[in-house]
Structures are given as structure tokens and as C-alpha cells.
């Protein structure tokens, strides 16, 4: 099988790897009625969107964000699927060669969510993604690791390229938004705001938990956001721009 981005490189799907893959779609109960896709934008701070997010039938999150403590009133607790960037596993948990307990304690907040990994995007992602899978199995964790199919991500990139989104790679948030539109009847996005000021012109951090900016040139964020705005304008999805109304 060819990798998504390293497309000249291939991986042999051995019996051991095949056993790691689900027999049928783990999301076979779709379409879900109301879905929340929660980005990590600083606009979520003091938004009071937590209760609204948690009332959704299915909640998508990106890159293992914090959801516990005071922040939960803004971002919610519920998580059904969360993407995992293997670089986080490498940097924060030393590729799970150690720090397995710390990793398992941190992901406990996600309950029985799916951890979605890009194991077949770059060859360098494979071993770390598999390590997450095996760690969850070894410790009988309630979460389950699943992998993006490289052909799906290639098709997705190809589709958005025809709409003008030409990037080295689509961002996790944009991939998950695209998947949610296929899996859900109604999609609402929270925390998608790639600007340094809010609508009220107040300065905000890049993420709700830090101000670390993305690598320049890797994703086409402005073009992605333009597409999201167009989808919002057409009523295909809803975009939450500011505070949520509390009951």
C-alpha cells in the first residue's frame, strides 16, 4: 500500500498489521444527527460553549487538546473521536518508549473515544502510530486507535485542490470537518478562527491552551478557512464565531 504523502514509498500489510485494522467501519452507526467539530482556536476561551458542545450526538476533536478543569465550561468534556499527531507522541511522550502511564492518564479524559492517527501518511509516522495502538491494547485502555486510510486522504486532498486549497497537506481540523460532513446530518464548528483578534477586535491566543503558531508553509490555513466560510454561507455547516448562549 502506498503512503499518502510519501506516495513513492509503500508498506506491506502483513498479517500482524491486518489484525490491527477494523473488520468493518467503526463508525457504522452513522449518519449521526448533530455533530460538533471542536478546533483548538483561542476564540473558545471564555466562550461558554461547553454545554452546547457536550449536547451533540458526536464530538470530534483535534490533536489531544485539554478538556478538563476550568476550560471544560468553554470546550466541553465529551469526546467521541480525537485526532493524534504522531509528533505530539514523539515530543511529549518520547514515542511511548517511556511515559506510557502519563500518556494513559492524560487520554483518560476522552473516555472511550477513538484515537485517529495518520499511520500511513508518512513512513516516519507508522511506528509511533502503531505504538499508540499497542499501548492501548497492552493496558486494556477504553480508547481505541484507528488509522486514516491513505487513499481516503489522497482523494480528500485531490477534491479540495480542485476548490483551490493547494497545500503540502490538509490540516487535521480540515480533514475532520470534511469527514464530519460525510458522517453527520448537521455539523457545527467551534474554535475555528485563524486570526489573532476576535470579532470584537480583542487579542486572542492561537490555541485556547497556548499561543504556539503552526509551521509556515505546511498547511494552507487561509484557503481552508475560506472554504469553511463558504460552506457556512451555503448552510452546509454552521460556524460558531463568538460566545455561546447559555441557558
Residue ranges and their predicted role:
Residues 1-247:
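Metal-ion/cofactor- or nucleotide/acyl-coenzyme-handling active-site neighborhoods
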